[in-house]
Amino acid sequence: MKADPRVHWFDVDVSDPEAVRARINDWTEERTRGRIRNLLSPRSIDQMTRLVSTSALHFQAEWRRPFRKEKTAPRPFTRADGTEIPASMMQSWMKARFARGEEGRMLELEYVNGYVFHALLPDAPSGLERLEAQLTPATLNRWTDSLESCEVDVWLPKFQREAEYDLASELSALGMARAFDPARADFSGIGRSSDGQPLYLSKAVHKTFIDVNELETEAAAATAMLTVTMAMPKARPRLEEFHADHPFLYMIRNGTNGTILFTGRMTGR
């Protein structure tokens, strides 16, 4: 890893935890071009901290077929509970890849850099949780394999979202519970603290930012894991509609190999 120029290692003096936190936050902010700030909150590092593993990812790309700003108009966005909120809805007739399933539809919008934006829209405003529950790698592949190029009437809300998550419970549910248990964690492959005490994970913090507008999408994500000691146009052929005026899932993926960089849900909250 030290030979990889994208990996940065530095030793710190945890006798000054706030200085350490500031240095890590500055590194993350620089790598995400200012979009992820204060990844680590005050007092998240103390003198028992032995290792902080931080990752950062920034994505910014223009649409291959941009939306026209003058077409953006206020429209209601219906949330899962049936209430409506105003949304700035981007609108365009465009050639895009589209698929329709039993309970929803998928739209693929291209970026100029070879990445794609996938939006998965349930038929009903209350259908997002059911659609998510059915989404597995296999079902996602079936959706993408079904995509076909056609003319689509696209409505997509402009949105900007920031979120912060503590991933400890999610990672534990995925089989990493031992890593967070001071009595069972085994990081002997990494080493021990200078006082010989074993290491364990105390928390895993993840922050995200995404901005979707007429010209481009910008997204950023950062994760920190802390290790401590025990202490209406003319008719067109095959016209489809994709009106994202209620909750939907979205992903930014590599258009060649399908790798998911970002995923989220637009719920109107």
Each language-model region and where it sits:
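Feature captures eukaryotic membrane-trafficking machinery centered on endolysosomal pathways
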Residues: 108, 236-269
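Extracytoplasmic and endomembrane cell-envelope/extracellular-matrix remodeling and assembly machinery
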Residues: 133-134
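C-terminal, non-catalytic macromolecule-binding modules
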Residues: 137-140, 171
